[in-house]
Every structure is written in C-alpha cells, then in structure tokens.
C-alpha cells in the first residue's frame, strides 16, 4: 500500500517554535529509514508527521496547532485510525514558495498526448454519474481502473535555513481515504515514508497564518488551475498575530465536521484505489515523472474525464455554509469532510477546446440535449454547461441550481493568499469549499472589484484589523434573499472584512436549483476581465456572456433614459475632501469615478432587488494600524429607501462596480431636484477627481444603443445565444485567416447574394463584390449611413464636393406649387421667381437665365436644372447623372447662362453652322390646390425616375405663333417630363390669349428671357387665361422651346414622318419611353431615319456603321447617302401651314451664345422652311460620312475606290452648296487616317497619345540574376513584374482588334488569317500560354520545386486579376486545370492553404457557369485600364450570328440582331481606349514572347512519369 504525499509550496514563516520536536523526530526517522529498520514509536511519529502535513481544517486553523503540539501524546496506540481520522481533511500547503507551483495535474507538454486515452464508454459512464447522482456509487465502484490513481507530488524542499512552520495553509491536491479495515503498515509504506521523509519534514512545517477565507477546493483537477497569486511573505508575517487570535476564537467555538455516508463511500473507494495502485507505483517518484507508459496515467487537465471518484463534489450537510471563492493554489483540489454526491456540478464546457470531448455520443449532450428538459440528456446538459434561468421576485435574488441539493447557504468568498498574478488560470470555475462556520473574512483586491452585495456587519469595525493582502475577490452573493442595508464603500479596500451571516430559509426547490452557469460567469468575469494582471490572458468568458448576465439580472425598463451630468454635480464631484475607509485602512490607489457602466440596464433600470442603503455612523472611518493618507472615491449619500443596482458585470475596472451605484444614486438625487451632492462627513468622504476624466465620464454615460456601432450590432444580432466552441484535438490550431476577409472568403455586403457559381474542379461561391472597386451600396444599412453622413456621402459621391448647395436665400425665393393659386404679387418687375441667379431681378427686363431644360436629356441635365417640366418645388439644384442608383438627388453646380436648345450630336458638333432660332413660349402648367390624389402622389415621387425614363432631345419644327404653341403643348403633371400616359398627363382646353395690361399674377414659373434684347420700357403683357389658373407672361419672356416641335412626343413625330411607309417597323414599347428602336427596316428606310431633320439618333448611326456590312456593301451605303443629299427638293410638305417654322438643326454646337440668339431672332420670320429643311438633311448626311471616315477608316484602307468616291463628293457638290468648311474638315480627317495606316504598315507608327502619357510609370522590378550572363528563368522574375509585362503584351494585341474582324464570324471563316488577323493572334497566344504553364510544372521532377512553380503561377494569376487583366487570369487557370497538372495530387497537397484558397477563388471568378455571370458582373464594375477575356465576346458573337435570322418575317433587315452585335463590338472597343502605364522591361518581355510548351499528349506522359 502506498501513501501518497502532497505537493506543497513552502512558506517561510516566523512561527517555528511549534514544530521543533517534530523536526527532531523526523531527522531520527531519516536515519532509521536509511537502514531499512523502523520501530513502532518512529512509525507512529512518521504517521503523525504525515498526518500533520495532510491535515487541514478550513474552519479552524488552530486545530492544526493543537495537533502539531500534541502529536507525540495522541498517536501512540492507533496510528492507522489517526490517519483515517485526519486524512479526509484538506491538505495544507505553504504559501510563498518560488514559482515551482505548476500543478502536478499538468505534466510536461511532451506527455500530453499520452493522456487522451479515454473511451466512449467511459465518457458516457461519467455523464451518467453527472446526470444521476443516485447511481454514482455504483459507477464509482465499476470504474476502479488503473487510470484513476492520485499520484504523489513532488514536494519542493525548502532550504535548511528556512524556519519550520506549524501548519500548512491549504492544499491544492486531493488525498485519498485509507479505510479503517487496514490494520498495519507494510514494508512498502515504510519504504514510501522513508523515501519521502525529506520532503515531509518541510511539509510539516506549516504556517500559523489565519487563512480562514481560504476555501476548500473541489476535487476536480480543473479547479486547481484557477489559482490566485501567492501571498507575499511580508503580508503573512504582518497577519500572523491577528490570524492566530481568530483561530483561537474559532477553536473555542468547537465547530466540528461530521462524517457522512457519502464521505465513507468515497473514502473506501479512495482506499481501494490506493491499494490497487500499490503494486503499480514504484519508489517514491515525482508526480510529474510519467515517462514509463506502464505507469498509471495521472490526473491532468483532461484526465478527470476518467476519474469517476471526482466527477461530482458532494453538497454540504445542513447547517454548514459553502465558501465559493478563488482557490488559486496550483495543485489538485479535494473535498473537505463534507464531501458527497450532490454538490454543485462542474462546467466542463470550457475544456471542450482542449479536445476532451472526442466522443460523438457525448457531443450530442451539448448539441441535442434540451436545456430545460426533464430527461436525462437535458439534466446532463444542465450539469455540464448550466442553464440560464433566473427568477427575480420581490427583492429576493434567487439563483436556480441544477443539482438537487438540500437547503444550503452559499457564501461567495475570496481565497486568501493570492497576489495579482496567476500561473495556471485555465479554468472558469472557482473552487467551492465547505465550512461549518458562518464567519469568514474576505480580503479584496486592488484591481479586481467585488460585487456590491453585502451585509451591515461587514462594515462594523473589527477589534483586530488586518494587514493589507492583495487578492482579487470574487462576488459576494448570498444564495437566499439579500438585503443591502448599508451603502457600499467607494471601493472595497484591501483590508475590508466581510462577515456574511447566511439566512436560513425553508426548503425550496426553486432556491435549490441555482443557476450555476450564471455564478460561474460572474466569478470568471470578475477574476479574468476585471483583474489587471489577467488582462493579457485570453478569457474564456466573452463580452456577450457578461452582457447576457446583466440583462438577465435586471428588467428592461427605462430603455431610452440616459444619465446627464449637471454642472453642479460635476463641480461637486471635482471637489476634494477628506478620506473615507469603512472599517479598514484606505486603499493605496484611488480609482477614478468616471469609469461608469456602459450597459443601459445597469445604468438606467431599477431592479426589483430591495437594497436599502443607510448612512449610519458605523460607516465612519475607523482606526487602522497601517492606514495611509490616500483619499477614497466620492461618497454615497442617499435616503434609506434608495434602490441600488445589483452587481454590474460588464465593466472593465474595479471602480465601475461602485461608480455605477453612485451614478444611480446621484440620478435619483437629480430627479429630486437635489442638484448638489450632500457631503456627509460623518458617513463618507469625497475624493477629488481629475478633471481629465470628466469628458470620459460623459462619453461613458451615453447609451450605447443611442448611437450604436453597426459592426457591434451585427455581431450581437448574430450571437443571440452564446454557443460552445467545437471540439478539436489539442494539437490543431484554428487557422488564423479564417475569420479575416481573404480572397477565399471576402467580406460580403449583400443582403441577398447572387447566384453561386463554381467551376468543374472547385465549387466555391464568389460574391459579386468580392473585388475592391464595387460600390458597396447594396445594404440598406450602409445606404442610410451614407445618406446621413456628410463625409461618407462625399466619399461615395465625389461629385457632391463641387456641387452648389441650396442656400436659404434661394429657398426663400421659391414659390411652392400648392400656393401658386393663392399668391398674387403686385411687383411688375419680378415675374420670374426661379432662375440661375438667386435673388430678385429688380429691372423691368427679366433677363436672368432660366434653368428650364430639354425634356429628359441626361447629358444636358448635367449642365442645366430641370424645374420647368416637373411639379416638384423648383429649386436651385439640378440632377446630375451618377453611376450609383442610390444617389437619387445629387446637387450639381448650376451652369452659366446656357441655351435650352437641344444639344447637338457628337458627330455633327463641328459641321453645322449656327442657324437662327425662333422664340416660343413653353409654359409649365402649375397644379393648383386640387383634390387629385394621383397628382399629389406623383408630386412626391423621386426625380430619379424621371432621369431614368428620359429621352435624348428631339429636334422639331417651331410653330409660327404663340397661340399654336400653347394650344399644342399640354401641361404635364407627372414627374416624367415627356410622359403622355393618361393618368399622368392633363390636356386642358386651349387657353385664350388676351393682350393688354392686367394685374400681374405669378401663378407659375414664368420663364425669363434668353434673348439679348432687354425691353426695359415694355409695359405690354400677354395674359394667358387657362382654366386652372392665370399666368402672366411678359412679351419679352419667351424662351426657345427645347421640347419636340409642335409639342408632340416622339411617337407622334415618328408616326407623322413614317406614316405612309411600310419598309420600317418600330418597337412601340420603346417609343412610349421616348426611345427609338427599330425592329426591321430596309436600307432606304434606315438612311431616311438616320438623316431625318426632326429626329436625332446618334446611337443608331453608330450601330448602323458597325454592322451595315452584314446586309449590304460600303459602296451601296455611300450611294444611298449621296442620293439622300441630293433629294432635298422632294421633302414631304407636312408642315405647309407652318411657313414661319424654323428648322433648328440638332447637329449644331451644344450651346448658343447671345449673338446666335440675336441671329435666330432676326431670322425668326423667314419663310424658307424647305430650304432650311434641306440644309438640315444635308448636314445629317455629312455627319454620317464624317463619322464613317473618322471611326471606321478600316473600310477604306483596302477599298481605294470607295475613298476616291467620297473625296470627289466632298470636293464637288458639298463645296458647291457653300459647305466648304465642312468639306475641309472631313478631308483633313481622311488625310490623317491615311498617314496613320501607312505608318503602321511601315512599322514607324508613333506612340499613341493617350491619357496615360503624362502619368508616371511605376518603378519596374528587375530580375534577380546572380550573374550578368545568366540565362533567366521563371523563378528569377518577380510575380508582379511578370504580370505587368504580360498585361502590356496582351493589351497591345487586344487594342489592335478592329470592328470588322468581329462581324460575319470573320475569326472563324476559312480566310480568317486575312479577315481577322488580330483576333487570330490573340487566340493563338491564349492557346500557347496554358501549354507553357503546364510544361513548366511537369518538367520539374522534384516535388518541392514543382509545388513552388505552381505557387508562382497562382501568384501571377492573382496579380493579373489585381491589374484587371482577366485574359491572362483565364490563360493561367487553363494551364493549371489541364489534366497533366491537375492530376498531380501529391504536388497539390503540399501547397499552403493560402494558395489553394486563392486558386479556388480565381476558378470561381472565371467559372463558365451561367455564361460567365460572375466574371461579367465583376468586369462591368472595373475602371479603365482593363483587359477583358476576349473569348467571352467571341462566344456571344457566334451565338448571335448563328442563332438569329438575318431577315425578319416581312423580308426586311433584322435590325435587332445588328443592334445586339453592335453593342458587343462597342464593349470591346471600350476597353481599347486606355492603355496601361507600365514601363516595359525588355528581358522579361522577351522571355514572355518566346514561351513555348509541349502538346497535351506529351504533357500527360511526362506527368505520369513524375507521379505515376
């Protein structure tokens, strides 16, 4: 049989007189043991000494003194019985040893792997022990295997000079009971004692210090890890006298523990374990000596799973109290004499991280067990992780315990003998000690605050003050009803004694079932989060746990209330006053009171817990031997019925606990109009605070829910319930980049993600905005934040920085629409209210430039505001086109005085001379105060819809009279300017115009004069009578109409111009949206449409020139254009009655100056309608020819006859018609294009002057060559520089692609080398580069270098993606996905996860699923320069060409097909405009141009060789 020693920490104490005799006898025993002989007397002395070392009575330390002083007399007859009588008590340790205090339950790291040998059956058996206490005895008897041995401790020996001590303070190792049936000592016992006697001599030297607050730890090995720091020797020496006196008093009380049945059961089981391990355990080895595998496995942090004797600790007997505190000793803890079966269960959840719960069946207890269920799974789950149920009723705080324990009074106490540092604090639980005494003392810490729940007797001045002992104190909570009758101190000082007498109450199951998990979280949070020394340690409790506890403790009342500090209160708090120390000496450091709770329930809601605060004279500062002069925080002075908050749990420093109470009380004082704090010097003393903390206090007082952090709110919403960490093996760490936004898992902002795509090889979802350039405005939360934040608005919409803001003077000049009927001004001089220039025009001429614009022209809306055609209140801002749909109203600067004439098309801007312009009145019919609900609804619509439904301007003929204009232009009441749908358009009867002087009434937005003529003396007015309201317009206030002529919309104009033609079919749906889309037409009809004098469609012109070769020849088109030019005499006379109309060309310059306006007014009465119309048609023809020559000169490079015909036409009829300037412009363009083509053929092409020519090139990265003459390889070049040079090569080839190579499938015909040489070159290189990638990988026979090559290509592809070179990304991925490379499983397995994640991401990005949907979405958000993957466009062109008919059913040309082809070609041309600004590196560029590779069959053979 083996008697196991206990590891102890040696405390050098001055109390050495009581053990002199024992040390002498031990020396005598040493000599006897060396000779392997022993007498009965010496044996008794050995056992007595060992008994003294293991004997620890938590309630009475003086019992140890008596045992040590009388050990020679008591134990002479029955040594074994004396051992059995004492062995169940808690072992003593000596405090103050060197840091050799690593728990013996934790072996060396090398041997950790040997401890995880538990089986599934053992786990389940242990859980049955947890869940069914009545069956624990049977399970304990069945589980007596060799793995549950309690090893002996390696006891550090103290130096010879250290004085012996009388008794050990506490024990952190469990000791086993030896049954009384054992009647003698065997030789092995003597051998064991002889081997360990040297250590036992030091162990018997125990200290006499009073550590009554030290709790007896529960025997779970994990509790041994929750250690408090070791007490200093000086503090122990200063406490010896006081503690010894208290020990004597406790000894007189005669409180003795009684042994229960459960105690006997465990004692017999422990003895059987000792007997069984006697044969296994050899000589007195160390606990940590576990090198031999045949030796039993000693308890480690995880081996308690198989230790069935210490699965559950027993509840205390009735009449005893439990001290739950921080047992910070470093060895295994054991239960005191009152150990049984039904004690508070352990929370093993935190150990799941260490890999203990490897069994699947056991894991179901955490995942499938019902928390509140009555079944076995629910009970086991509650025993393991605890339930979060709390009942708060009428001032009594009741915690529900999951274990069915009897009526006990739990006292949360602190363990003495702890400093600010803990060596192995790996457990969340505090140790629970059983004590039959109800009196104990707690020594609070400097750093870790205690919960302010206390008893009046705590602050009574003790007769014997104690010296300060730095030890973090846990919460002091009585398990029954707690009534706070004393005000809490400003903060608990070092020597504050708390004597809490538990209140007896009848048996109540609800009170018995205390919420153990809540208590665990409270203690762990107090010891970990609030301890400054534990700040660097990762705590097992999270902020969510602490906030959850706070929310469960208090009600949800007063959600919106917040604390506001008044000036008087701030002044009072800043006033210093005398010190205060309740029954103790003051603390050495004053905690600022500004650190207040941020939790709104702690700071605002009044709980139901009755806490009466009485400011009695007992709280005055008492004398202390070691009192200092430091001041304590501000006092609390309230009425006796003030409610105080329960323990706050979410603070981050010790002062927050008491400061929250102060804040609550001071708020009540403020509510009672007590603006000044009553400084009661008899009770408390104020502490002056630094003014630095005042601003911090105001910040802390703010409700976190008033201005929440969006990220915090999202995390809180996701983690409504705190979940346990998943099981993992101890050696596997969590990847560091899993929770960080990476290429594989980018940060997502989509509320509804797009469709997930995957390639054939890797199936990984990629969101649309996994790239950095995407505007992340899909989340409504982000939209709202941007809308309410000025800086963010400027960040997302840079156009707002240069915008004109709406000033107050502008708003004052705006007449609301709903008041247009009622406002009548007698000011004849200011009829125009809305103008560009804010302020009133006091001259009789209203010549300020109006902001009325063309209907719906998006391009022109950037230059002028739209206020005349909308029923929203006119204002100074205008709508600017923004790429983001979220910027519905983006103010842009109002332009300088500009003409409302229609902006000319981009291809006729420099051809048409400025024609004269006529004047017409365009009135916005104001909507008076009517009962039309639809009108009111439309007036509230956003103006963004009107922009989206806008239409390019339409040039129409001008009516000759004002009467015709007014009668044919219906006022619009819709937000869409040109909408003519019945619900949104009202056509009033034609108004009657009366000439004469009448009282002016500004009932609408009278447009100002755009003319240069200022009729200052004009008193004659045009009064236009409209049934809705009266509008007074000066005769000079005439603006040139920018709407379709005669007020007709686009559908009407198209119907009039092509009413007799059957060779053209329009799409009526697009006409209703003011867009022209032709379904099918003949060549003649298309030429007539493109050159029509009333319609301007530049997009149709470009589409026609791109695709006309698919249905006709260039010579035929030129012939049709010349015929149209000469067809001016046969224009339809549809407007014969409008002889005074002026045909305004839409192909003139965008703005018209005052001189042009004068010319237009001087020619307004001309009768040359036909001549002007013919001139407009001729300009239209010349515009098409100019665009053809400039943008599509490749049609003339191989067709010299066509070019000669155009030159003859320009030098002949065009000059004869007086258009010499237009002819010279086109001829210059022809000469320039011819010179450029000749330069390209000769190879002397000049460098293209692009917008990047002025940019600085980024510095190139030269290759790393060891020798100048070394042949460079792929590994010598930098990944980024390879991507740059590859991008330069490919973009140069891409920019040479011509539009004619994309039509008629020229790239797939037999003569493709001639018709599409540039596309063929790109296709060849795209097929060569993947073979080169595969060849570089397969040719390397060494596995490591082969993996490095794969990593390099993945990195190059990633760099190409960052450079927007998607063509190179696709090429490299194609090479990596080839079968010869992809089959190399051993090579791919050696790649780091970082590269594999990047490879999967790139594959998902370029996946062909859903017709490259993800790639297309990403591409459309990239800015130039960009290099797209050309294969996607070629695929689209192939499908369009082969899947659609060239002609429609009526035999006409299928224009829809041509339009779609033109859109694809225009997108290809879009990315050719801007080139990359990288400096070419010749050595890398030449290397990339000379690449080559094996064919796929040879690659596969080589792949089989390197990896069969």
Curated annotation (Swiss-Prot):
InterPro entries: Ras-like_GEF, Ras-like_Gua-exchang_fac_N, Ras_GEF_dom_sf, RASGEF_cat_dom, RASGEF_cat_dom_sf. Residues 1074-1234 form the N-terminal Ras-GEF domain. One of its GO terms (biological process) is Ras protein signal transduction. CDD domains: RasGEF, REM. Keywords: Coiled coil, Guanine-nucleotide releasing factor. Residues 233-250 have a biased composition (Acidic residues). GO terms for molecular function: guanyl-nucleotide exchange factor activity. Residues 1-73, 128-182, 197-272, 396-517, 565-593, 606-727, 831-1021, 1153-1172 are annotated as: Disordered. Residues 9-22, 33-72, 199-216, 255-272, 413-447, 574-593, 606-660, 668-687, 831-855, 862-891, 942-984, 993-1019, 1160-1172 have a biased composition (Low complexity). Residues 465-475 have a biased composition (Pro residues). Residues 128-150, 172-182, 492-510 have a biased composition (Polar residues). Promotes the exchange of Ras-bound GDP by GTP. This is Ras guanine nucleotide exchange factor Y. It comes from Dictyostelium discoideum. The gene is gefY.
């Amino acid at each position: 049989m083996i008697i196991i020693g206990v590891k102890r920490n040696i405390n050098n104490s001055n109390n050495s007189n009581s053990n002199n005799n024992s040390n002498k006898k031990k020396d005598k025993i040493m000599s006897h043991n060396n000779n392997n002989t022993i007498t009965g007397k010496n044996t008794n002395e050995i056992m007595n000494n060992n008994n003294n070392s293991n004997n620890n009575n938590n309630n009475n330390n003086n019992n140890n003194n008596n045992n040590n002083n009388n050990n020679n007399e008591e134990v002479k007859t029955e040594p074994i019985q004396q051992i059995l009588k004492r062995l169940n008590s808690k072992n003593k340790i000596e405090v103050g040893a060197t840091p050799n205090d690593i728990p013996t339950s934790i072996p060396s790291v090398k041997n950790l792997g040997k401890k995880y040998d538990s089986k599934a059956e053992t786990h389940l058996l242990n859980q049955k022990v947890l869940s069914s206490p009545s069956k624990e005895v049977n399970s304990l008897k069945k589980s007596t295997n060799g793995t549950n041995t309690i090893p002996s401790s390696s006891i550090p020996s103290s130096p010879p000079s250290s004085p012996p001590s009388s008794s050990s303070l506490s024990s952190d190792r469990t000791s086993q009971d030896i049954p009384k049936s054992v009647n003698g000592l065997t030789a092995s016992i003597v051998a064991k004692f002889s081997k360990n006697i040297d250590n036992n001599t030091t162990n018997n030297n125990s200290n006499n210090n009073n550590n009554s607050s030290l709790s007896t730890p529960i025997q779970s090995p994990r509790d041994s890890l929750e250690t408090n720091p070791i007490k200093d020797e000086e503090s122990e020496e200063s406490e010896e006298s006081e503690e010894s006196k208290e020990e004597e008093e406790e000894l007189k009380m005669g409180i003795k523990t009684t042994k229960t049945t459960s105690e006997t059961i465990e004692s017999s089981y422990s003895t059987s374990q000792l007997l069984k391990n006697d044969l296994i355990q050899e000589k007195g080895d160390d606990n940590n000596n576990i090198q031999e595998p045949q030796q039993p496995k000693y308890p480690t942090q995880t081996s308690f799973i198989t230790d069935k004797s210490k699965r559950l600790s027993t509840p205390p007997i009735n009449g005893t109290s439990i001290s739950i505190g921080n047992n910070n000793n470093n060895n295994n803890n054991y239960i005191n004499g009152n150990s049984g079966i039904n004690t508070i269960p352990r929370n093993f959840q935190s150990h799941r991280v260490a890999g203990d719960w490897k069994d699947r069946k056991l894991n179901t207890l955490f995942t499938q067990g019902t928390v509140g269920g009555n079944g076995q799974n629910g009970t086991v789950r509650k025993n393991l992780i605890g339930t979060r149920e709390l009942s708060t009723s009428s001032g009594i705080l009741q915690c529900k315990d999951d274990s069915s324990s009897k009526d006990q009074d739990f006292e949360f106490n602190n363990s003495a003998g702890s400093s600010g540092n803990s060596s192995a604090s790996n457990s969340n639980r505090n140790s629970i000690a059983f004590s039959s005494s109800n009196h104990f003392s707690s020594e609070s810490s400097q750093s870790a605050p205690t919960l302010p729940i206390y008893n009046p007797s705590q602050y009574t001045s003790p007769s014997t003050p104690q010296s300060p002992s730095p030890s973090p104190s846990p919460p002091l909570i009585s398990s029954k009803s707690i009534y706070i009758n004393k005000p809490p101190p400003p903060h608990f000082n070092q020597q504050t004694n708390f004597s809490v007498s538990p209140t007896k109450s009848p048996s109540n199951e609800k009170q018995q079932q205390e919420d153990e998990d809540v208590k665990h979280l409270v203690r762990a949070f107090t010891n970990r989060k609030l301890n400054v020394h534990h700040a660097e340690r990762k705590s097992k409790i999270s902020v969510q746990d602490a906030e959850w506890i706070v929310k469960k403790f208090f009600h949800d009342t007063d959600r919106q209330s917040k604390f506001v500090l008044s000036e008087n209160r701030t002044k009072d708090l800043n006033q210093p006053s005398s010190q205060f120390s309740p029954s103790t000496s003051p603390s050495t450091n004053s905690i600022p009171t500004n650190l207040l709770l941020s939790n709104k329930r702690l700071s605002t809601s009044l709980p139901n817990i009755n806490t009466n605060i009485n400011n009695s004279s007992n709280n005055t500062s008492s004398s202390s031997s070691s009192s200092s002069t430091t001041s304590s925080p501000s006092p609390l002075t309230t009425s006796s019925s003030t409610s105080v908050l329960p323990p706050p749990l979410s603070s981050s420093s010790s002062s927050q606990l008491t400061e929250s109470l102060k804040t609550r009380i001071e708020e009540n004082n403020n509510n009672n109009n007590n603006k000044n704090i009553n400084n009661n010097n008899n009770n408390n003393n104020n502490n002056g605070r630094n003014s630095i903390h005042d601003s911090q206090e105001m910040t802390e007082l703010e409700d976190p829910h008033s201005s929440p952090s969006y990220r915090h709110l999202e995390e809180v919403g996701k983690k409504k319930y705190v979940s346990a960490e998943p099981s993992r093996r101890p050696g596997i760490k969590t990847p560091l980049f899993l929770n960080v936004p990476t290429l594989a898992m980018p940060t997502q902002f989509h509320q509804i993600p797009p469709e997930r795509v995957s390639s054939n090889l890797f199936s990984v979802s990629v969101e649309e905005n996994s790239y950095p350039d995407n505007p992340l405005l899909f989340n409504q939360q982000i939209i709202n934040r941007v809308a309410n934040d000025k800086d963010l608005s400027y960040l997302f919409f840079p156009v707002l920085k240069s915008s004109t803001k709406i000033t107050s003077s502008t708003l004052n000049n705006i007449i609301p629409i709903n008041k247009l009927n009622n406002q009548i001004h007698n000011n004849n001089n200011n009829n125009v209210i809305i103008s560009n220039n804010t302020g009133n025009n006091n001259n009789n001429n209203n010549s300020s430039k109006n902001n009325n614009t063309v209907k719906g022209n998006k391009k022109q809306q950037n230059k002028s505001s739209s206020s005349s055609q909308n029923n929203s209140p006119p204002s100074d801002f205008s709508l600017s086109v923004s790429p983001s749909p979220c910027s519905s109203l983006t103010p842009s600067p109002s332009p300088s005085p500009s003409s409302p004439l229609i902006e000319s098309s981009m291809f006729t801007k420099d051809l048409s001379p400025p024609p004269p312009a006529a004047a017409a009145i365009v009135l916005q019919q104001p909507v008076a105060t009517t009962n039309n609900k639809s009108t009111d609804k439309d007036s509230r619509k956003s103006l963004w819809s009107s922009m989206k439904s806008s239409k390019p301007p339409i040039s129409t003929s001008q009516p000759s009279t004002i009467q015709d204009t007014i009668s044919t232009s219906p006022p619009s009441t819709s937000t869409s300017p040109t909408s003519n749908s019945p619900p949104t358009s009202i056509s009033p009867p034609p108004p009657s115009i009366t000439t004469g002087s009448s009282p002016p009434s500004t009932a609408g937005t009278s447009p100002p004069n755009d003319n240069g003529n200022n009729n200052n003396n004009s008193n004659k007015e045009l009064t236009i009578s409209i049934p809705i309201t009266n509008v007074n317009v000066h005769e000079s206030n005439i603006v040139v109409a920018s709407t379709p002529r005669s007020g007709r919309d686009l559908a009407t104009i198209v119907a009039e111009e092509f009413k007799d033609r059957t060779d053209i079919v329009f799409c009526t749906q697009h006409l209703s949206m003011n867009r022209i889309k032709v379904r099918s037409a003949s060549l003649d009809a298309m030429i007539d449409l493109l050159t029509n004098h009333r319609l301007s469609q530049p997009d149709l012109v470009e589409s026609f020139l791109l695709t006309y070769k698919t249905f006709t020849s260039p010579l035929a088109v030129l012939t049709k254009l010349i015929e149209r030019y000469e067809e001016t005499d046969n224009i339809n006379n549809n407007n014969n009655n409008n002889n005074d109309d002026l045909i305004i060309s839409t192909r003139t310059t965008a703005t018209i100056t005052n001189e042009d306006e004068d010319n237009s007014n001087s020619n307004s009465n001309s009768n040359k309608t036909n001549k002007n119309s013919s001139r407009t048609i001729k300009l239209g023809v010349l515009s098409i020819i100019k665009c053809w020559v400039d943008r599509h000169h490749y049609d003339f490079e191989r067709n010299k006859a066509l070019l000669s015909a155009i030159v003859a036409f320009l030098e002949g009829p065009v000059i004869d018609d007086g258009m010499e300037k237009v002819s010279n412009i086109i001829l210059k363009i022809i000469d320039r294009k011819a010179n450029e083509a000749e330069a390209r053929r000769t190879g002397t092409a000049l460098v293209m002057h692009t917008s990047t020519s002025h940019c600085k090139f980024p510095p190139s990265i030269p290759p790393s060559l060891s020798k100048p003459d070394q042949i460079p390889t792929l590994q010598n070049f930098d990944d980024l520089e390879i991507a740059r040079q590859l991008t330069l090569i490919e973009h140069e080839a891409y920019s040479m692609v011509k539009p004619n190579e994309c039509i008629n499938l020229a790239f797939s015909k037999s003569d493709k080398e001639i018709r599409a040489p540039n596309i063929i070159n790109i296709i060849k290189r795209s097929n060569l580069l993947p073979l080169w990638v595969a060849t570089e990988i397969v040719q390397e026979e060494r596995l490591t270098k082969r993996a490095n090559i794969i990593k390099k290509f993945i990195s190059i592809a990633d760099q190409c993606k960052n450079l927007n070179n998607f063509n190179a990304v696709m090429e490299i991925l194609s090479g990596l996905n080839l079968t010869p490379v992809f089959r190399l499983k051993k090579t791919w397995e050696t790649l780091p996860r970082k590269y594999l994640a990047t490879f999967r991401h790139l594959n998902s990005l370029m996946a062909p699923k859903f017709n490259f949907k993800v790639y297309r979405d990403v591409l459309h958000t990239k800015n130039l320069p960009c290099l797209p993957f050309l294969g996607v466009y070629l695929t689209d062109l192939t499908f369009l060409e082969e899947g659609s008919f060239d002609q429609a059913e009526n035999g006409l040309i299928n224009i829809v097909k041509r339009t779609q082809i033109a859109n694809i070609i225009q997108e290809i041309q879009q990315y050719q405009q801007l080139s990359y600004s990288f400096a070419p590196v010749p050595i890398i560029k030449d290397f990339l141009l000379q690449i080559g590779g094996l064919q796929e069959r040879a690659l596969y053979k080589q792949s089989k060789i390197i990896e069969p």
